[in-house]
Amino acid sequence: MSTDKITFLLNWQPTPYHIPIFLAQTKGYFKEQGLDMAILEPTNPSDVTELIGSGKVDMGLKAMIHTLAAKARGFPVTSVASLLDEPFTGVLYLKGSGITEDFQSLKGKKIGYVGEFGKIQIDELTKHYGMKPEDYTAVRCGMNVAKYIIEGKIDAGIGIECMQQVELEEYLAKQGRPASDAKMLRIDKLACLGCCCFCTVLYICNDEFLKKNPEKVRKFLKAIKKATDYVLADPVKAWKEYIDFKPRLNNDLSYKQYQRCYAYFSSSLYNVHRDWKKVTGYGKRLAILPPDYVSNYTNEYLSWPEPEEVSDPLEAQRLMAIHQEKCRQEGTFKRLALPA
């Protein structure tokens, strides 16, 4: 039986940063574009690119490094837009765990990772810092990295600042400890990448679906842009509408995660060319991409002007770190104004 319904698979259970997708649905923005969307949740986040690439699902969300690796492994997907730009990603741990800013302090520790590429990243870093993969114990945690740290199942684990780190900070607050005891060894700094773009969360499409339905994809992105604009213009009102639809997120932790995600939302939705070049090179360095791999992204389905890329990405990252720390302390919704 055929259907005009477009299937869209999230990268995880509904989270604060999924708000533009659900508001585009609940506020009727998809309907305005003549689209009938089915928003789906994965039981296993690692299945997302395979399900989309095999054509079982039309569209979805995935991080940049996974999107690149998917196509290299024979799952034809293409990024058509960005949702969350360069969230800080790294090895999270708690002060007092015996781990310090020295990467070698991870020797003998249990380190959690989401999926196989997380382990590949850690293994590559161990070589860079004079260690071997056998010097630590790898534990696959899925999306439960913060939970496993709190429960003592792992000593550290890969997570992102606006999600798992906030979860650790909330745990610390309940223990009467300072939130600053939640620490992160940022992978972009450890690996000398110059950006956290490998974990940029993207809107991706099955290539055959994209080829056959270019206008539907353009309309989808128009609806997403309208929802994103709405979120950025009035984040508090947008959140109230979101939790009315997703009451499970009506809690302090989710709200604080949303505040920390706010600065990372891509306002233009554009794929950033420089980021794709860097992460494609990183993927080749990790040997998950062949030497001749061509990046699988396009901006041709975005029907508004492309913004200029920041002139100094390293300075932008430095300023974002200061901005996010201020957001943690003050609990406000602010966007970072970058110098030209």
UniProtKB/Swiss-Prot annotation:
Q: Which cysteines are joined by disulfide bonds?
A: none
* Organism expressing this protein natively: Saccharomyces cerevisiae (strain ATCC 204508 / S288c) (Baker's yeast)
Q: Which GO terms describe its molecular function?
A: 4-amino-5-hydroxymethyl-2-methylpyrimidine phosphate synthase activity from histidine and PLP; metal ion binding
Q: Which residues carry this modification: N6-(pyridoxal phosphate)lysine?
A: K62
How does the annotation summarize its subunit structure? Homodimer.
Q: Which UniProt keywords apply?
A: Iron, Metal-binding, Pyridoxal phosphate, Thiamine biosynthesis, Transferase
Task: Identify one Pfam family in the record.
Answer: NMT1
Q: Which domain of life is it from?
A: Eukaryota
Q: Which GO biological process categories is it annotated with?
A: thiamine biosynthetic process; thiamine diphosphate biosynthetic process
Which protein, by its recorded name, is this?
Answer: 4-amino-5-hydroxymethyl-2-methylpyrimidine phosphate synthase THI12
Residues engaged in binding pyridoxal 5'-phosphate:
G115, E116, F117, G118
